[in-house]
Amino acid sequence: MTETLAIRPTDAAKDSGALIADMGARARAAAVRLAGAPTADKAKALVEAAKAIRARAAAILAANAEDVARAQANGLTAAMIDRLTLDPARLEGVAAGLEAVAALPDPVGQRIDETRRPNGLLLQRVRVPLGVIGIIYESRPNVTADAGALSLMSGNACILRGGSEATASNRAIHAALLDGIRAAGLPEDAIQLVPTTDRAAVGAMLAAQGLIDIIVPRGGKSLVARVQDEARVPVLAHLDGIVHLYIDRAADPAKAVPLAVNAKMRRTGVCGATETLLIDRAYGDPATIVGALVEAGCEVRGDADARAIDDRVLPAADSDWDCEYLDSILSVAIVDGVDGAMAHIARHSSHHTDAIVTEDQPTADRFLAGVDSAIVMHNASTQFADGGEFGLGAEIGISTGRLHARGPVALEGLTTYKWLVRGEGQLRP
């Protein structure tokens, strides 16, 4: 019994390794073709895939209902079930997202800059695809469509490994993507879906040097941490979305109250949801903001000063300031002006998204320049931290690192560049 149990993980790893090696080789071949594919063909594939999403809507929603029922039976959190759930409106959003990506400018071949050297050499930097992208994600079936579309339009092949909780939904959406690819005459291996939920497949993807050029994880902290710790290929990711909203003393109450409620409560399970509210000690009416949040169904946890504002505020533990709740829970701290807010953010930030509400432009400019996050906002809900809202069509994820891409990663972020050097026989002396 003990010997059998010890062997099984090794066998699973071997099987998964062979599977990912085969998928990677086919993806690499597809990437070579995609790198030179005409823009019109890539756009056609996505437009036809959108049509297929709509034509297959009943089947996709039925598959999603199976996933949701299983998730509920397994006791998944309300936030995760919300991310998993598709309804007709959300599914139409998936289809519209494909069309939006198809309409975006093709980054492949774009000239970034050029210069003529004194010796006559013409140097040009042009955008080229990354190659093969591995996307590992949980819960959100829309990622199947978004990631597939962005990879394809940027000339990359992709290998998608969705979470077990969304298996039926992912397969149904992937089938629609394949309909579009076939209609455009592009290689079907351009968008592949890992057919197993075995966790060993994730390990095989993380070790697939030479087959996968970059890994993008989309999911919870444990998934992203595992990917960052174990990957032997580059990773584009964010670990946490500890998002702050700061209400300055010069904030307009007519903006501050609805912004605070929207930033937290519009959708609590997205990474752009505010998790910590910072209120300037000199702001005139903090009670209205806190009361509006409580009345909207938010559990508010605060420091001693915040608890003095409203007796419905619960005590905040030290860990609350570093917590991504992804739920109807918010921590509130009272700070001494913009300096206090920026100091708090510097201590607890995940460098994702932070925002200020103020009518004082110099204070806003100081915050925008001084906060080291991928997205910094002024008088806007943090829930706008989304590639679609940035006009990018969709996003493959939000990167909080400092190398390559930062913030919402869409078409341009899925390319690199190469140098073209044009000469007329120049010799180096």
Swiss-Prot record:
SUPFAM superfamilies, A to Z: ALDH-like
Entry keywords, A to Z: Amino-acid biosynthesis, Cytoplasm, NADP, Oxidoreductase, Proline biosynthesis
One GO-annotated biological process of the protein: L-proline biosynthetic process
EC number assigned by the record: 1.2.1.41
The keyword ATP-binding appears for this protein: no
Gene3D superfamilies with a match to the protein in the record: Aldehyde Dehydrogenase, Chain A, domain 1, Aldehyde Dehydrogenase, Chain A, domain 2
Database matches in InterPro entries: Ald_DH/histidinol_DH, Ald_DH_C, Ald_DH_N, Aldehyde_DH_dom, G-glutamylP_reductase_CS, Glu-5-SA_DH, GPR_dom
Assigned GO CC terms: cytoplasm
Molecular-function GO terms, alphabetical: glutamate-5-semialdehyde dehydrogenase activity; NADP binding
EC top class named in words: oxidoreductase
Localization per Swiss-Prot or TrEMBL: Cytoplasm
Catalytic activity annotation: L-glutamate 5-semialdehyde + phosphate + NADP(+) = L-glutamyl 5-phosphate + NADPH + H(+)
Pfam families referenced in this protein's UniProt entry, alphabetically: Aldedh
Pathway annotation: Amino-acid biosynthesis; L-proline biosynthesis; L-glutamate 5-semialdehyde from L-glutamate: step 2/2
NCBIfam families named among the record's database cross-references: PRK00197.1, proA
PANTHER family given in the database record: DELTA-1-PYRROLINE-5-CARBOXYLATE SYNTHASE (PTHR11063:SF8), GLUTAMATE SEMIALDEHYDE DEHYDROGENASE (PTHR11063)
Protein function: Catalyzes the NADPH-dependent reduction of L-glutamate 5-phosphate into L-glutamate 5-semialdehyde and phosphate. The product spontaneously undergoes cyclization to form 1-pyrroline-5-carboxylate.
Entry similarity comment: Belongs to the gamma-glutamyl phosphate reductase family.
Name assigned to this protein: Gamma-glutamyl phosphate reductase
Species in which this protein is naturally found: Rhizorhabdus wittichii (strain DSM 6014 / CCUG 31198 / JCM 15750 / NBRC 105917 / EY 4224 / RW1)
